[in-house]
């Protein structure tokens, strides 16, 4: 979580919305990993389904899904300055309850070599994936 906060700060993100199950942002290890960025990014803990349900339909919601659009294809991201980016749990991904709100599903493709699934990593660390998504989004 600390690395996500620090990365978000680097890319100009002002708010991060978390489910109540997310690690406490004031955990000493999280604070250390933020390297001061916790003072620049507001962290909100709330019921995500309720929050998504009240958002205006015009707000683009980008979600990282294995079957999403390759982030390197044209128009993978909406051309809005304001949007919401959903990053899922490393082990479980984005819950079905939250998936229904995604308007722009995207995927970071793997370029790992090997034909068998056991020859490739099954996923990226969520903080690394967050950095890749934010960097690609900021290209717009």
Task: Report residues per predicted region.
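Short glycine-rich loop/turn motifs that provide flexible caps or phosphate-binding loops at active sites
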Residues: 1, 35, 87, 92, ...
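RNA substrate-binding interface of SAM-dependent RNA methyltransferases
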Residues: 1-68
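Short, surface-exposed linear patches
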Residues: 12-15, 38-41, 66, 83-85, ...
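Amphipathic, positively biased hydrophobic alpha-helical segments used for protein targeting
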Residues: 19, 47, 74, 99, ...
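Structured adenosyl-cofactor binding patch, chiefly the S-adenosyl-L-methionine
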Residues: 27, 32-36, 96-140
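Active-site-adjacent beta-strand anchor residues
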Residues: 45, 88, 127
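Active-site/ligand-binding-proximal alpha/beta "capping" segment
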Residues: 62-121
